[in-house]
UniProtKB/Swiss-Prot annotation:
Entry keyword Ribosomal protein: yes
Any one Gene Ontology cellular component term annotated for this protein: ribonucleoprotein complex
Lineage: Bacteria, Pseudomonadati, Campylobacterota, Epsilonproteobacteria, Campylobacterales
The family this protein is said to belong to: Belongs to the universal ribosomal protein uL4 family.
Name used for this protein in its record: Large ribosomal subunit protein uL4
């Protein structure tokens, strides 16, 4: 069974909690589909090329069909001509959206949590607030955890805590309402406030 490491006020190990066993039984393909969909949604369709119907000019046949000894040509704007159209190029009309059902999103999130817990990289603590709002204090928390990078999930994200963690490259703080399977997967460790973890497991 997947275990959540419980930390005390000093961020030292104080015990373990069990994740629901069904989390680890979720097909990992659900996680793959969600991550693929999430990354696709971040793509901006800014790349654009002109096709035959978009490029200007080329309406007149450049030379007669026969008698020159050279290849025939009907337009100076085909894709083989310099200044011509692009064949099969990207256009800004493309939609990268990939649909993932609500249930599938939930299953992907459960699997992501189970994977982190199986590696001993899912932690919980009563409070993760940085009341001073100072990056120095936030950095001390990361050092105590002893992880390369970490996702911090708050039950109610306050401005001071956000300011404290915002300038650190090796962590990302997010409200429990905004956390998703991709964020859980991409970080080496995840630490959640106890109330945030309870609300997540209660929903599942």
């Amino acid at each position: 069974m997947s275990k959540v490491v419980v930390l005390n006020d000093k961020l030292e190990k104080a015990g373990e909690l069990d994740l629901p066993s069904k989390y680890a039984e979720v097909n990992p393909h659900n996680l793959y589909l969600y991550v693929k969909s999430y990354l696709a949604s971040l793509r901006a369709n800014t790349a654009h090329t002109k096709g035959r119907s978009d490029v200007s000019g080329g309406g007149k046949k450049p030379w007669r069909q026969k008698g020159r000894g050279g290849a025939r040509a009907g337009s100076t704007r085909t894709n083989v001509w310099v200044g011509g159209a692009v064949a099969f190029g990207p256009t800004n009309e493309r939609n990268y959206f990939q649909k993932v059902n609500k249930k599938q999103k939930r299953l992907a999130f459960e699997r992501a949590l189970a994977d982190k817990a199986a590696k001993g990289a899912l932690f919980t603590a009563d409070s993760l607030a940085i009341e001073s709002g100072k990056t120095k204090d936030a950095n001390a928390v990361i050092k105590k955890l002893g992880v390369k990078d970490v996702l911090i999930v708050k039950d109610l994200l306050d401005e001071k805590t956000l300011l404290a963690y915002r300038n650190l490259a090796n962590c990302y703080v997010v409200d429990v309402a905004e956390v998703n399977a991709y964020l859980v997967s991409v970080f080496n460790a995840v630490i959640m406030e106890k109330s945030a973890l309870e609300s997540i497991t209660k929903e599942g």
